[in-house]
Curated annotation (Swiss-Prot):
Record GO terms (molecular function): asparagine-tRNA ligase activity; ATP binding; catalytic activity, acting on a protein; nucleic acid binding; transferase activity
Organism name: Streptococcus mutans serotype c (strain ATCC 700610 / UA159)
Keywords: Aminoacyl-tRNA synthetase, ATP-binding, Cytoplasm, Ligase, Nucleotide-binding, Protein biosynthesis
GO-annotated biological processes: asparaginyl-tRNA aminoacylation
Enzyme Commission designation: 6.1.1.22
Top-level EC class: ligase
Lineage: Bacteria, Bacillati, Bacillota, Bacilli, Lactobacillales
Catalysed reaction, written as an equation: tRNA(Asn) + L-asparagine + ATP = L-asparaginyl-tRNA(Asn) + AMP + diphosphate + H(+)
NCBIfam families (UniProt xref): asnS, PRK03932.1
Protein name per its UniProtKB record: Asparagine--tRNA ligase
SUPFAM superfamilies cross-referenced by the UniProt entry: Class II aaRS and biotin synthetases, Nucleic acid-binding proteins
Source organism superkingdom: Bacteria
């Protein structure tokens, strides 16, 4: 048999042709003289049909019967090389099927643990290395890939330079209770929570820069929105105001959604995602509301029948129920801007004329998906930044290089970070963030 394989996703370009595909058997059915194989190859799923008389006619009685019986008794996840004629099939969601003409077993599979029945979450997570092969998990990973691709495309088209921040840091520059500590040749080192501080150095050297990589937070949170290891897309850019930064962030998120619609429509279909809703998010301007106005809204509606959040006061941080209500109230992605300085990081620039508030924004995704972006305008004055570091009980020596940036041509600059898995969860419409990364790391989950 030929080794010149084509991908399932490309069979639409070979209607009426005999092709060879390398694939795995996701499921099978049939009886008597016909067998149906559900095949997958990582690009898509589709069906191959084998007719017993065709195999006997092509290979003779004995050999044809042997091949057909092999097909009928294939186990789930058997790897095969299959040849056949591509045909249109309007009954299928995929639109095509394969009229099988030959088949060869490449790799056997016995007692595959994830059978076509309901399994508990713990069982599926214990077998995550196999669960990734399922139709839904494949669709989510294709959406993740589309988001990453669209990110690189957006930053390239907008003049950004890829800048790689370190993952290991020699000081506990943030709250050590949220940091993972490791030994670095006899000295303590910490896994990065964010590449932002280093990225600001890149912005002062190269202008617009972005970073994409894993970050780590030792938060003992057991929610559907939290992971201890996840991927962040951070960006920093000089000579830009806070309002201009919000415009850039909005354009970025809309580009990511459009990128998934363009590159992974079949994946969205498998997940039954409401694509009209996604298109609405692209078409409409994102809402912008101040923190104080959002608090007032929450207070005004806290007695409504359909609310399930606790009372909140000005100066309090939002919980997940508050974020959900705010984004659902407006029905589109919503920037909450100008939080109290006491709730945010030391490096954020105060709102002019209101030092108790800072020039920052969290982008809340609708449908209960919560914060997907956090960003701010950064403090540019050396003395002000130094005072803030001390006010927060931090050691200025740990921020020597960061402070140094303010002494040599400091300029207005902004930045933001987008959590990849939260964005994927939102666009895919899935319920839990653990499915948005190949091998999730959570509280009490570090295997496989």
């Amino acid at each position: 048999m030929s080794k010149d394989y084509i991908s399932i996703i490309d069979v639409k370009n070979h209607v009426g042709e005999e092709v060879t595909i390398g694939a795995w058997v996701a499921n099978k059915s049939g009886k008597g003289k016909i067998a149906f194989l559900q095949l997958r190859d990582g690009t898509a799923f589709f069906q191959a049909v084998a007719f017993k008389p065709n195999f006997i006619e092509k290979f003779g009685e004995e050999a044809g019967l042997e091949k057909f019986n092999t097909i009928k008794h294939l186990n789930q996840e058997t790897a095969i090389e299959i040849k056949g004629i591509v045909k249109e099939d309007k009954r299928s969601k995929f639109g095509y099927e394969l009229d099988a003409t030959d088949l060869k077993v490449i790799g056997t599979s016995d007692n595959y643990p994830i059978t076509p029945k309901e399994h508990g979450t713990d069982f599926l997570m214990d077998h995550r290395h196999l669960w990734l092969r399922s139709r839904k998990q494949m669709a989510i990973m294709q959406i993740r890939n589309a988001v990453i691709y669209a990110s690189y495309e957006f930053f390239d088209q907008n003049g950004f330079v890829k800048f790689d921040s370190p993952i290991l840091s020699g000081n506990a520059a943030e709250n050590t209770t949220d940091l993972f500590e490791t030994d670095y040749f006899g000295e303590p080192a910490f896994l990065s929570q964010s590449g932002q501080l280093y990225l600001e150095a890149g912005a002062m050297a190269f202008g617009r820069v972005f970073d994409f990589g894993p970050v780590f937070r030792a938060e003992k949170s057991k929610t559907r929105r939290h992971l201890t290891e996840f991927w962040m897309m951070d960006a920093e850019y000089p000579f830009m105001s806070h309002e201009q930064s919000l415009d850039l962030q909005e354009a970025y998120v809309k580009t990511l959604i459009q990128g998934v619609l363009d590159r992974a429509p079949q994946a969205l279909g498998i997940l039954e995602r409401d694509t009209d809703l996604l298109r609405k998010y692209i078409a409409q301007p994102f809402k912008r509301v101040s923190y104080d106005d959002a608090i007032t809204l929450l207070q005004e509606h806290e007695e409504d029948e359909d609310t399930d959040y606790e009372h909140i006061e000005h100066g309090d941080d939002f919980g997940s129920p508050h974020e959900t209500w705010i984004s659902n109230y407006f029905g589109i992605p919503t920037f909450v801007v100008n939080y109290p300085a006491s709730l945010k990081a030391f490096y954020m620039k105060p709102v002019p004329g209101n030092p108790d508030r800072v020039l920052c924004a969290d982008l809340l995704a609708p449908e209960g998906y919560g914060e997907i972006i956090g960003g701010s305008e950064r403090e540019t004055d050396y003395n002000t930044l130094l005072a803030k570091i001390k006010e927060n009980g931090l050691n200025p020596d740990d921020y020597a290089f960061y402070l140094d940036l303010r002494q040599y041509g400091s300029v207005p600059h902004c930045g933001f970070g987008l959590g990849l898995e939260r964005m994927v969860t939102f666009v895919a419409g899935t319920k839990h963030i653990r499915e948005a990364i190949p091998f999730p790391r959570m509280l009490h989950r570090i295997e496989p």
